[in-house]
Amino acid sequence: MGEQRPLALAWSPWHDRLHRRLHQHPQLLPQRQPLLLAVSGGQDSMALLVLLQELQRLHHWPLNIWHGDHGWHSGSAVIAADLRSWCQQRDLPIQVDQAPQGSTASEASARHWRYSQLQQRAEELGADVVTGHTASDRAETLLLQLARGTDLAGLGALRPVRPLFNDSPDGAQLRRPLLGFSRADTAAVCRDLQVPIWHDPSNQSPAFARNRIRAEVLPVLEQLHPGCSQRMANLAERTSQLRDTQQELSQLALQPLRTSTGLDRRRLGALQPSTRRQLLVIWLAQQGVTALNAALLEQLTDRLALSAAGGSCDLPGGWRLQWQGDNLSLQPPAAGH
């Protein structure tokens, strides 16, 4: 249970820092845009909440709060009740949803449930979703992506703004205004502004890969190279910007390759492997194929070389890529896949 201390809402250097960032990057949280804050009760999301509540009078966002009770530990219902009471005392509208038993057994399933609930609530409110992800989260994600195997998009993960769901680009957006703050910063925000924090013991569980990165890997790297977490977060941001540039240039390069049935396989195959891979990723994503790992992309890049024979390849989601002669085409999943 969080320590119930009085809330000291006042302008602080933390408010000034975020306010300046929002003026420099107005697309992060557009003024008057309804916002749905995903609040766990931990230090990052509570810092986000208290900063945006005070900045609301300048930026005029309608604010709503959402909390998801995953049921991962015996005290989760108490945290949900305490957080609801805390918000209600401050006239902050909050919705608390409880996950069905067994629906959040893994990190992936929990994330799917959480984001599905957020999407539903955001659509009801006409709001965008805001999370308290920090530069520290970005460094952890970079390490996880490197360990799993990734491409440029994976290295630039945790973008400041993106669609909540990739297959709904015109739907609710996911916004992360605290990527310029570290986890140490959010702890200081909560301390300086006397904001309560509810500690979730599942964040310490070694069963989750991110927790082990946070507790076992990053501390060692920080001892060896102090400040490395922030440098990794900065690298992720630069990579994200580089990818945006690459995407725009690749769109221009893709136009001459398009045919009535797909792509000109010979013109694609004559390109350098790295260019061929990038254009293939963009074209497939436009068709709805996104879950491609680095190993499969390398395999396809080699098999689509000009000197390679015709062939086919099954892709995630039931898609099938086929190529023969000049033609490269994509077959959609069978009905009911």
Swiss-Prot record:
SUPFAM superfamilies: Adenine nucleotide alpha hydrolases-like, MesJ substrate recognition domain-like. It comes from the Bacteria. The keyword Phosphoprotein does not apply. Its main location: cytoplasm. ATP binds at residues 40-45. One of its GO terms (biological process) is tRNA modification. It catalyses: cytidine(34) in tRNA(Ile2) + L-lysine + ATP = lysidine(34) in tRNA(Ile2) + AMP + diphosphate + H(+). It is an enzyme of class 6 (ligase). InterPro entries: Rossmann-like_a/b/a_fold (IPR014729), TilS/TtcA_N (IPR011063), tRNA_Ile_lys_synt (IPR012094), tRNA_Ile_lys_synt_N (IPR012795), tRNA_Ile_lys_synt_subst-bd (IPR015262). Keywords: ATP-binding, Cytoplasm, Ligase, Nucleotide-binding, tRNA processing. GO terms for molecular function: ATP binding; tRNA(Ile)-lysidine synthase activity. GO terms for cellular component: cytoplasm. It is found in: Cytoplasm. Its EC number is 6.3.4.19. The N-terminal region contains the highly conserved SGGXDS motif, predicted to be a P-loop motif involved in ATP binding. PANTHER family: TRNA(ILE)-LYSIDINE SYNTHASE-RELATED. Ligates lysine onto the cytidine present at position 34 of the AUA codon-specific tRNA(Ile) that contains the anticodon CAU, in an ATP-dependent manner. Cytidine is converted to lysidine, thus changing the amino acid specificity of the tRNA from methionine to isoleucine. NCBIfam families: lysidine_TilS_N. Belongs to the tRNA(Ile)-lysidine synthase family. This is tRNA(Ile)-lysidine synthase. It comes from Parasynechococcus marenigrum (strain WH8102).
